[in-house]
Amino acid sequence: MSTLHANTVQTSSGGPVTLTSQAAAKMYINFNGTGTVAIRDDLNISTLVDLGLGDYQLNYTTNFANISYVMNYGQKNATSGRIMVNGGGNNQADPTTSRSEIMAFREHSSLEGSFDPEFVYVTGYGDLS
C-alpha cells in the first residue's frame, strides 16, 4: 500500500481543485428542548425560538438560496414512548430561506401528543445565498 503526503493539491495547470459531489451541512443544531430551551452546539443558527410544547423555530444566520434545502431531524429522550421530530411546526408552516419550524411529538405511549425532548438534532443541506 502507498501513502500520499501533500501540503497542496492543484490541477495540472496550477489552479485550485474542483470538488464534485460535495454536500457539507450548511446548518446544524443540537439543543435541549425541555424547560428554557438551550443550544448546545450549532452552525448557521442566529436564534432558537420556543413556540410552545414541542414546537420550535430555527432562524438562520445566513439564508439558504431557496426553499429546496433538505433537513434531517432526530431526538433522544430518557422517557418511554417513541418521539418523532418533523418539519413544519405545530401549525405546519412552510420553511422559508431564513427560518424553519419543527415539532416533536410522542407516539405509542399513554402520554401521546406534543412533547419537549431533552435532545433535539437538526441538520440542513443546500446552497446558501
Question: Which residues fall in each region the model found?
Answer:
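Intrinsically disordered, low-complexity segments enriched in Ser/Pro/Gly/Ala and basic residues
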Residues: 1, 11, 20, 79, ...
